[in-house]
A protein has these predicted regions:
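Conserved Radical SAM active-site core
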Residues: 1-84
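Hydrophobic faces of well-ordered beta-strands that scaffold small-molecule active sites
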Residues: 31-33, 65-67, 88-90, 125-127, ...
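Surface-exposed amphipathic alpha-helices with a cationic face
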Residues: 48-60, 119, 150, 187, ...
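Glycine-enriched alpha-helix->loop->beta-strand junction motifs that scaffold or abut catalytic
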Residues: 82-88, 122
């Protein structure tokens, strides 16, 4: 699919073999591949075949295979792709179910289940928290959030991302961008509760 003037391709279709050929072209310059989206796990059979092909190729099997996901994949889905992946980065956009439904239109229970399952199987690379001023509820639920994080593998990185208005649309276009002071406050509250492996943005807009 392309824009009306066909000047900016929006989607490209590849077979697994074609994507492997592209991966092989750049293999000498990369340490791994990360599939993102949208939500990449919506194409789970393709991802399984792609990761499986990487792990089966002598010249590619050194590459890590990571998934950037919203965490809504079922546990059965994670079990299917787990043998061929090296890790996942998962977004937890709020702590309470009510706030998560407000922000995304869906419950976060499956996301929490995904996070726990991936951590228990040494497949959770990074847990991401998106701070949206006056919207997210991390600080209001800091005790529960910290307890949850501390129940995970201690090697997991916690990344706090700052919401910004660029590229968003709809109601979110009117939401305030997060600033450094707000991110540092959340970071400090987590550190006080023994959550230590935290990354914060280098640039704020």
């Amino acid at each position: 699919q392309q824009c009306p003037r066909q000047s900016s391709p929006m989607t490209l279709t590849y077979t697994v073999d074609e994507l492997i050929a592209i991966t092989r072209k750049y293999a000498a310059f990369i340490n791994g591949v990360t599939v993102s989206g949208g939500e990449s796990t919506l194409q789970l059979p393709f991802l399984i075949d792609y990761f499986k092909a990487i792990k089966a190729a002598p010249d590619l099997r050194h590459l890590t295979c990571l998934i950037d996901s919203n965490g809504t994949l079922s546990l059965n889905g994670w079990q299917k792709i787990a043998p061929f992946m090296d890790g996942a980065m998962i977004d937890l956009k709020s702590w309470s179910e009510e706030t998560h439904i407000y922000l995304t239109g869906r419950s976060n229970q499956r996301i929490k289940e995904s996070i726990k399952w991936l951590s228990n199987h040494n497949l959770l690379t990074e847990l991401r928290l998106l701070y949206i001023p006056e919207k997210t509820d991390y600080l209001e639920n800091i005790e529960q959030l910290s307890h949850f994080i501390n129940s995970l593998d201690e090697s997991i990185t916690i990344r706090i991302n700052a919401f910004h208005q660029h590229g968003v649309y709809g109601e979110a276009k009117n939401w305030r961008s997060a600033n450094k002071e707000q991110i540092i406050k959340l970071q400090n509250e987590l550190i006080l509760r023994k959550v230590n492996l935290i990354k914060t943005p280098n640039i704020y807009t």
